Amino acid sequence: MRRWPVVLRLMLLAGGSGAAPAQVTIDNFERGLDPEWKVKSFRGATVYRVVAEAGGHVLQAESRGTASGLVRKIDLDPRDYPMLSWRWKVAGTIAQGDERTRAGDDYAARIYVIFPHWFFPKTRTLNYIWANHLPQGTFLPNAYTANAMMIAVESGPTLAGQWLTERRDMVADYRQAFGEDPPRLGAIAVMTDTDNTGAMATAWYDDLLLTR
C-alpha cells in the first residue's frame, strides 16, 4: 500500500457484537456479494465482482494500479473457532513487488484478520498473503506498522492459475506474530492491490470459513 494509513484504516472497520456460532461461513458467494461486505478505498478502486466458475460462484478482484478492499465485521472469540480456511487463485504475482519496502507493498491476493482494540494503536492484524518474493512460511512485519504481520501462505507465480485451499490456525499465528494470545476477532477483509507498483493483478477468492 502507498501510505501507512491504508493498513491502519482497514483496522478501524473492525467491530460488532454477537455470540460465536458453531460454524461461521464468512461467504461462499453463491448468492452474490453479500451487503455485509463494505468497500474500503485507499487509492482508486479495485473491481470486485462475483463471477460464475466451475458450476459455482467466486469473488473476482481486478486491480489496475488501485487499492481497495472488502471488509466484513465478525465478532467472536478466535480461541473458540481458531481455524480460518479459504480458497484462492491468482493470475500471477507482482514482479515489482517487495514485501520489505513501502514502495513494494502490493499483493495479488491477501486476506486480513483484524483484532481491534479500543485504543487504536494497539489494533493488530494478521495478513495472509500470496507473496511476490518472500519465502513461503515467512512472518514479516508490514513495512508501515509492526502491528500488521504479513504471513506468506503462498509465494511466487509457480502455482498461478490454480485454485489452492488454505487452512490457518489464527490463534497459533497470532501467538507467533505477537507473542501473546489474541483478543476478540473483529473483522475479515480481502484485498488485491497494486497502487504502489502501478501493476495489474487479478485474483479470485472463495469459501471463507471459520471452524474449530
Please provide the spans of the model-predicted regions:
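Bacterial N-terminal signal peptides
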Residues: 8-17
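Solvent-exposed strand-to-loop "edge" motifs in beta-rich extracellular domains
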Residues: 87-93, 116, 171
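Extracellular/luminal beta-rich ligand-recognition
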Residues: 104-148
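Extracellular carbohydrate-recognition regions
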Residues: 21-41
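Extracellular beta-strand ligand-recognition surfaces/modules
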Residues: 106-111, 146-156, 160-200
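Short carbohydrate-recognition loop motifs
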Residues: 49-69
